[in-house]
Amino acid sequence: MKKIFLLNYAPPSSSIYKYSQRIYECTSEYSEQINLRYSNRSNKWEQTVQGRIFESPVKNVLSANILFSSVFFRNARKYILNSSGKDRVVHYTHQTLSPFKFDLERSVVSIHDNPYTGLKYGVYTSDRQNTIDKMMFRLYSRSIKHNLARYMKFKYVITTSDYVKNSLIKYGFRNEITTIYPPVGNQFVPIEGKEKIREELKLPRDKRLLLSVSTDQPRKNLKLLEQLMKRLDKSFQLVRVGKPILNSINFSNVDQQTINKIYNACDVLVMPSFEEGFGSPVAEALTVGLPVACSDIEIFHELCGKYAFYFDPNSVEDFERSVTTAVENLDLYKDKMIERSSNFSHLTFCSNINNYYDQKFFM
């Protein structure tokens, strides 16, 4: 019997949970979502999560996931064994999950990040010069290296971009690696009437709105964005989905319809990141036809091709040039961007992931 177990560890608000959920939406006839919960800080697990929840008695993520996962989550492994046959497939939806002991040829992992930058202090984690932080990061990085070594024994690996795929090959992976781009949510669609949307969202109608959607991790390079906003004149206004920057207009915990309206209300998406494994905001901007001013890094070229305004992420002068050029050419790439966004549609993703499972495991 065709059966796939999707193992997730992330809370419902996270991009990793959404990735797991999107796979489930495409494969619900023969898949089941297994959620390994280390903590309930968001207090939303039971209300919003799909699938079964298996809870660790220990709330320390490092201990629960890395050091003793086979002990703390033995009920999850037992459930999978008892509710399926040998033809089961176990899909770990993120590389930080510590794998259980299942058939390596019927297991697959999705790896979302370049292992080199993911293991570098101050890229995905705080760059504070703090001894305790550094000690914890050393423990964390050792555990991730241990996980990666175990995943290198798998027959199959999925990556979210060719950039990550190439980094894994360089790292030493000799598995059968396949790139399947994550999908953009169905809520992202172009909307006419920018002024009306701005009025509804209480955004200024007489400003050039620059949109920034990100966490505040060091790799997001928000210091450069702050420098940019200090240089630009008052005709520009920053709109942030995330923590505030200077006098930005801020949104948080917005619903699906509102986030789409925010994209459609703004003039340019700004992405000064040093490092991304994929870069969902860029794919979302392409989908609605919002011009993108982004770092001149490999992953953004993979997503946007020639239909973006690139800049050196170490130069605020180049960032300013890129943004002003984008503002002066708002419709230059719009049609080509929307056309290119089909690579990241939910329909394309569903077709790719179902074909992948069939070809690798159920032929």
Region spans (language model):
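Short alpha-helical donor nucleotide-sugar binding micro-motif in glycosyltransferases
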Residues: 261-266
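Conserved acidic donor-binding segment of nucleotide-sugar-dependent glycosyltransferases
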Residues: 309-316, 323-330
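Membrane-proximal helix-turn-helix segments that form the acceptor-binding/catalytic region
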Residues: 132-157
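Conserved donor-binding/catalytic core segment of Leloir-type glycosyltransferases
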Residues: 204-220, 226-229
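Acidic anion/phosphate-binding donor-loop and adjacent secondary structure
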Residues: 175, 183-200
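Active-site donor-binding segments of glycosyltransferases and PAPS-dependent sulfotransferases
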Residues: 5-99
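Aromatic "clamp/platform" in nucleotide-sugar-dependent glycosyltransferases that forms part
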Residues: 274, 286
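Short hydrophobic beta-strand element within catalytic cores of glycosyltransferases
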Residues: 287, 291-294
